Swiss-Prot record:
This is D-aminoacyl-tRNA deacylase. InterPro entries: Daa-tRNA_deacyls_DTD, DTD-like_sf. It comes from Eremothecium gossypii (strain ATCC 10895 / CBS 109.51 / FGSC 9923 / NRRL Y-1056) (Yeast). Its main location: cytoplasm. The keyword Cytoplasm applies.
Length: 150
């Protein structure tokens, strides 16, 4: 499972010219689920996302506070392209990305656990399987790539 964690001052997602979700201070997550991922990977990712200290404290000392500590929001976007293999040729290979219906079940579980950890209203998401337009203001910029297999 791969999760790109971006610290943002705002983020939003639009599908077919309709605003689906938006947040203020927090994280925009891009979440990729592979055929090898299990519930253990989901649980590990939720712990990492909620506990990673990417925010400064009140004295502006960096890397002191987590999303949970600051009461921040999360906008999570499912993105199978994170699982692409690009080792050979010029066309990405998506064979290791989890199949749609299984990926949806796992992604929904990820969102459920994240909402349990951070609060129902703190976690927003896009539209699974849709073509989405995502925008964000990356603060720092701070962008972390987390992979449960590394």
């Amino acid at each position: 499972m791969r999760v790109v964690i971006q610290r943002v001052s705002q983020a939003s997602v639009v599908v077919e010219n309709k605003l689906i979700s938006s947040i203020k201070t927090g994280y925009m997550l891009l979440v990729g689920i592979s055929t090898e991922d299990t519930i253990a990977d989901i649980e590990k990712s939720v712990r990492k996302v909620s506990g990673l200290r990417l925010f400064p404290d009140d004295s502006n000392a960096q890397w002191k506070r987590s999303i949970k500590d600051i009461g921040g929001e999360v906008l999570s976007i499912s993105q199978f392209t994170l699982i692409a293999r690009t080792k050979k040729g010029t066309r990405p290979d998506f064979h290791e990305a989890q199949k749609g219906h299984l990926a949806l079940e796992m992604y929904d579980r990820f969102l459920d656990l994240l909402r349990q950890e951070l609060g129902e209203k703190q976690v927003q998401d896009g539209e699974f399987g849709a073509m989405m337009s995502c925008s964000l203001t990356n603060e720092g910029p701070v962008t972390i790539i987390y992979d449960t297999k590394e």
